């Protein structure tokens, strides 16, 4: 089934001109009550699609003031709602109309849930109308963090809402099927384009070599070869073989690999600012980025962290010229856009929590000096900031040349032309409601949820539960009784009353304070002693089947030992769990990382070295199947 992106036609093509340039030929969708200006003798070159893209960029750049150029270098959040809304208190912000009309900004990250595709498309169309009313009419590029799975944490991702719902990236890695990854990316692209989103702030290709890190669920696991293989399909699914009007551009992150954070703490926070390489293994973490560049990655984002104990200066990667210019651009040959992670210049708030600027290693620099340092490092655009006046000041004071600004602005404008935004930035809002979350897309997501389940243990082949009576009684935790009752089984109040127990648990973590920080699952990977004792009573009372949501590699040897069967899942609903338990679907997943045997083993392993944990309970690649329960290298089956 092929669903065309609203506002664009399948026959849209790139026409080669005699000059060797490429000109864009499209038949635009235009919202009712609005018209795109027609070409005439006075049409500027940059608005004339018969010219090649490089000529159009040159023409536009020559017309821009330094203030208009400065606005292009900023990419910040966009909140759904009135365009003149400025928020209040800790959520105060410049209004959208101010950022577009006064600050000349044209890159925004949609930072709110999408609950109605048509309304979101209409909202983005209104933003494009506002942008076209400015002096030069530069269209807006709207981006998003991942929003096709189960994670809800402003700053890292959103639940699917009206979009089709799939496993997290770590679940696609468990499935190990390049075709499914490509299909996911193509579906997500169609749904993004339908509402007007043209930039994906993903994939996250960090290697999960530090199992305590809070951001593993959006990675592809611990293995660089598997990560590299799958990310190629991911990028090509979003962008196509070449970036164009049918593409959603991707932002590959977090260079040079965000996984080896010291003690597993995340560098959003000052206590997690260090990235360490005790195994001298930086090269391993670069492999996915090399694959991404070869696959056509057009934009790369460095992480917040600062390297310690290496040949590099211990300053955050976006401030680090040897990382951005010498390593990424010169050594790896990347000539695309480098977008910083969010909030490196200005202190601010995320989810109501105060967050100092993540200027690790250069905290003592002024905001102006930080901006200059980032540009000098080789970055093009400031994420999560809305401070064009700093760029204007840098140029006016002779600290940064306007020619240097032009280098980055040229990259950013060219991307807009390649995406076709200058020729038609609008989408068909009514069609968006038909494309987003359509039955076919939803079915594909549900199939992937079920297939990605990983069967870790299956004592006495207890699963699938196929030959049980309708009078069977279940004790459950972690999901609503209505899911079981829809199968016409009975839910009871205690394990002692039940014939089976079905438990769904999140992987263990230590709760943290704060609005944003509280959503980051960090700290210990093991349940505390009180919780272990509570669970043990269930396992001793009734045959128990456990599903652990593996957003991180859980330390659960006691559950493997005591429960009858244990699954790992990576983003799935309760219907998917029950379909796998009752044999409607079969688990096909393989572990995308090692499962450590203890926290002592976790603490002893080197942060930058994959598969460095001592005596893992299960190794990378473990996964049983219903057809052949011992189809793995696990000693449990020997």
Swiss-Prot record:
Residues 1-18 form the signal peptide. Its EC number is 3.2.1.21. InterPro entries: Cellulose_Degrad_GH3, Glyco_hydro_3_C, Glyco_hydro_3_C_sf, Glyco_hydro_3_N, Glyco_hydro_3_N_sf, Glycoside_hydrolase_SF. Pathway: Glycan metabolism; cellulose degradation. The active site is at 341. Keywords: Carbohydrate metabolism, Cellulose degradation, Glycoprotein, Glycosidase, Hydrolase, Polysaccharide degradation, Secreted, Signal. This is Probable beta-glucosidase C. It comes from Aspergillus oryzae (strain ATCC 42149 / RIB 40). The gene is bglC.
